[in-house]
Amino acid sequence: MSKQLAAQVPAEPVVLGKMGSSYGIRGWLRVFSSTEDAESIFDYQPWFIQKAGQWQQVQLESWKHHNQDLIIKLKGVDDRDAANLLTNCEIVVDSSQLPALEEGDYYWKDLMGCQVVTAEGYDLGKVIDMMETGSNDVLVIKANLKDAFGIKERLVPFLYGQVIKKVDLATRTIEVDWDPGF
């Protein structure tokens, strides 16, 4: 890895998508975007991938729609064999590229690992995942081992103001109005 590339390695990596199977014989790949608008993944450059524990920068040469898929052509990936080597690689950028959000909006990555407590002080557990349901996002919370209700996992809707009362990213705490029995 060159020194120039080492300086550009993402300080705070965030996954924006994943490369899928190869398409055709000229090095095109399917891409699965995790951005809210699938095409937004192309707004964030440069892309990085990790291969054998080493960061590598990849350059997007072109992209287009093919049926329901998005397909990409990366610079230097010119045949099916080269494309196959990138299948399942996550597409990573530095989080500093992401736009600032308004009050009450959060990136999922920022909520991961936050401790969730009720307004009464009951510790519900830690956020381990998020789900998109269509109507609202849902926190997936891993309950503490000695949970008084014997619950291992909780699903709490991320409804700011209704269920979510306060998010404090500095202390990594989310306060909720939620019955611990659920």
UniProtKB/Swiss-Prot annotation:
Residue ranges the record marks as coiled coil: none
GO cellular component: cytoplasm; ribosome
Keywords noted in UniProt: Chaperone, Cytoplasm, Ribosome biogenesis, rRNA processing
One function term, GO molecular function aspect: ribosome binding
Domain of life per record: Bacteria
GO biological processes: ribosomal small subunit biogenesis; rRNA processing
Disulfide feature: none
Compartments in which it is found: Cytoplasm
Subunit structure: Binds ribosomal protein uS19.
HAMAP family: Ribosome_mat_RimM (MF_00014)
Family: Belongs to the RimM family.
Protein name per Swiss-Prot or TrEMBL: Ribosome maturation factor RimM
